[in-house]
Design a protein with these regions (language model features):
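DNA polymerase processivity clamps
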Residues: 1-244
């Protein structure tokens, strides 16, 4: 349907709206939507995004006048349309509307699907300390970072150490040596946490933010998730377990 005709027929029916930039930002994390257990795009409250139970990437709708969506999930097939989308909206009846060029197509949510209420992970999760951070120059091109990213996390003990205004990766390839790698510069020198995060998950985030500043919320301990945020995009990552 043509965008002008569509808007005239659906005025006041939208409960969540994302613009082109927010959709593009979210699609950087679209691989999360293709996991075996929770496939697709989730809408919940003011948020839309993806989760695979180990991590969550969502964009917040900044239109304060909109009430937010009921928790729904849409087929993973909509991702191909979102790659080209100028905007998307969730309507009061639960339908997802995606605008590509000047045309709008509607998609029904997956019926009777078990869907995690992603807004609760954003609104109800508690953190210990906060900081802004910036990536050390070209860290994702560093040969040590690349090596740690491809090696099985159970084969090498490695920790993400937030301390004294830095994030340093501490890795133990064998019992006699340690690798130290500066990853982030932090504004809050009192922020402190030693945890284990998945390198591939963190690499995805670092390639998204590039050299721009972003916000960090650190977990209370190494068993809880950390949150990374830039503008309307939230990325929550659970720690991984290391083999003794």
């Amino acid at each position: 349907m043509d965008i002008k005709e569509y808007n005239s027929k659906n005025m006041g029916k939208q409960v969540l709206v994302l613009k082109e930039k927010d959709i593009k930002d979210l699609m950087h994390f679209s691989t999360i939507a293709k996991n075996e257990s929770i496939k697709g795009l989730i809408a919940s409250g003011k948020y839309a995004g993806f989760t695979d139970t180990y991590r969550l990437a969502v964009v917040k709708d900044s239109n304060e006048e909109l009430q937010g969506a009921d928790t729904k999930i849409y087929s993973v097939s909509v991702l191909e349309e979102l790659k080209k989308a100028k905007s998307m909206a969730v309507l009061k009846d639960g339908k997802l509307a995606i605008q590509v060029d000047d045309d709008v197509t509607e998609y029904d949510p997956i019926p009777d699907a078990k869907v995690p209420d992603i807004k609760l992970f954003i609104n109800n999760y508690e953190y210990e300390s906060y900081s802004s951070g910036k990536v050390v120059e070209k860290i994702t091109d560093d040969i040590v970072w690349k090596m740690l990213k491809v090696v099985d996390s159970s084969d090498i003990k490695r920790y993400f150490c937030f301390e004294e205004g830095k994030l340093i990766v501490e890795a133990y390839p064998n019992g006699n040596s340690v690798l130290l790698l500066d990853v982030l510069e932090l504004d809050n020198k009192k922020a402190k946490l030693k945890t284990t995060l998945n390198f591939k998950y963190m690499d995805l985030w670092l390639k998204y933010v590039k050299d721009e500043k972003f916000d960090i919320a650190l977990a209370k301990n190494n068993r809880n998730a950390c949150q990374f945020r830039k503008d309307n995009l939230f990325y929550i990552v659970m720690p991984v377990a290391l083999r003794d």
